[in-house]
Amino acid sequence: MSLPRLCLGELINEDIHTWNSLCRQEITIKTYDNSIPISESSKKIRNQQYLTITFPKSSQPGGNKRLRPSEIQVTVPRHDKRNLDELQKPAHIWIRHSLRKKFQSPSINLIVRRQASFRHPYTHITHSKKAESKKYKDDKKETALKKISKKDTGPHEVDEKPKRRNKADKTPSKSSHGSQLSKKSKSKSETNPESKDSISVSIKHQKKEKRYSKDSKEMDFESTSTKKYSKSSKNNSDAVSETCSKNSSNVGLMVHLGESDAESMEFDMWLKNYSQNNSKKPTKKDAKKDAKGKGSDAESVDSKDAKKDKKGATKDTKKGAKKDTESTDAESGDSKDAKKGKKESKKDKKKDAKKDAASDAESGDSKDAKKDSKKGKKDSKKDNKKKDAKKDAESTDAESGDSKDAKKDSKKGKKDSKKDDKKKDAKKDAESTDAESGDSKNAKKDSKKGKKDDKKKDAKKDAVSTDADSESEGDAKKSKKDSKKDKKDLKKDDQKKPAMKSKESTETESDWESKKVKRDSKKDTKKTAKKATESSGAESDVSSKRYLKKTEMFKSSDAESEESLFKPGSKKRVDESDATSTDSKKDAVEPKRGIKMPSRRTTFKEKGKKIGTGRVPPSRERPPLPPCEPILPSPRVKRLCRCQMPPPPPKPRYAPLPEAKWIHKLL
């Protein structure tokens, strides 16, 4: 043999064992004689190495990769020693064996990995043990497949492998045929339900499903399970068809198909259990929704009934307000006539006095209307105090349209009067006309009294609530009117006092009027309080002689001081006769003794008791401050006594550690 042929044969054998290069499969290798000794071959290799070192060839892009000289020295003798038995066989046979070993082993590993990943993608927790056991079985079957493949291999050419793949595609095994049938059965069941193959396959699947679907009564779950099963069988058939193209052995494919069928059965079981568990849950949810819907319907019906009841209550309150406003409609007609005479009344003060008298007469009628409105309010306040008060106000506004027109005219008259005279004359005329128009809005007045007339008007409300009090006040008011008529002719020049009289009738008017009048009323009340204290000073001296007890004296004096503040007309009665004033005051004070008094009076009583002096009105709160100075030394005396006393033991919250020495000294 020539040297290049021997080198080529050795190099090709070396490449097959080391790198598994496919480039040199095309070269036809001829058998060489085994009679060549190793020493001659080694000499020839050395000569070749010398030539490669001295005359290096330029590396061509398409040329074969050459071995290093050190690798050639080491590997060639070893190869000859190992494969003495294999060299007896023809070269193409053992090359095919080596190639088959290398190319078949990774394909089987890939099949196992793909199937393992597809088998349990949905049950990592429940079927983990089964998956591990099946992997162990697959490993055993892989080793068996390798042994079978070694036995079945025979003498063939190198280029027969792609031919086998084509044959496997053209004439597949029974397992691949079954997978194709399952695919055809799907398409035929959807398109051609009359085909025999689809009927046979569907009957088999239905039988398997009926065995496991004894507990499930509804057919919807079976239809879903068949669909899912058909999808799983499709995936299994696809995976198996891929393995057919890669594997040449039919035995391994049959084993994999059997495993896939067993897994599909388990998958059906799991699907049915899952569907049954899910089918129970929505029924509960639907029941809850139905219950909620019924409850919401019942609540809506109840809310509608409650709304109807509220509307009925508001209608009743409106009817009660109508009755109250009927008495005020007659007065609203008189108020229009009074408005026409506004401009003429500015010049003549005698007409003002007559209108004040008429307004006082009308105020007596308005108080009767107040009583009726309060009775209707007590029933309405139980449900909603604020809402019913607003509704009563709205109902009175809607029904007394004439009174609203009267208000607008009165506002216009006020603006004209402010331009002409911004002083007290404008206030008199506005208050006298507003008193007449204000009678038609008793519901508004009563609803807004408690909010803005806090402490001053509580006593009036309590007095009006009782019938006996109202009668006693009615007698007192009649005496007031008689005294007022006599004094109006004497005091026409005084402009402040008629304003005070007109304010008595307009104390319970609307809010925007009361805000303007408050500032003037405070100044007038201070003046009246001073005069009342002068008269009360004389009364207190007489009462101190008659009554020895201080408690009764303070109660009567405080009640009288309140009346002097709220009712400035009382000072005039005192000037006339002390006996009549004391009798009228006692009648009003007796029912009020049982009623709670404001907090300011109680604190003032305590100060008065300590001082021991007579009654002091709230306008003179500053003078009682100096007597508080003798009270100061009493705590100083106590402090001196505390200094003389020994120090108290330490409190438990400030107690230090028990190891401290000063604690033992104190103890």
UniProtKB/Swiss-Prot annotation:
Expression by tissue: Testis.
GO MF entry, a single one: structural constituent of cytoskeleton
Compositionally biased residues, Low complexity: 173-182, 223-237
GO cellular component, one term: acrosomal matrix
Family matches, as InterPro entries: CYLC, Cylicin_N
Main location group: cytoplasm
UniProt repeat feature Sequence, residue ranges: 287-305, 306-337, 338-368, 369-405, 406-442, 443-475, 476-516, 517-547, 548-569
Chain segments carrying region Disordered: 121-251, 275-634
GO biological process terms held by the UniProt record: acrosome assembly; spermatogenesis
Composition bias, Basic and acidic residues: 129-172, 187-197, 284-326, 345-371, 380-394, 417-431, 438-464, 483-506, 521-533, 549-558, 583-593
Assembly information from the UniProt record: Interacts with proteins of spermatozoa head including ACTL7A, CCIN, FAM209A and SPACA1; the interactions may be necessary for proper acrosome attachment to the nuclear envelope.
Record's protein name: Cylicin-1
Organism: Bos taurus
Gene (UniProt): CYLC1
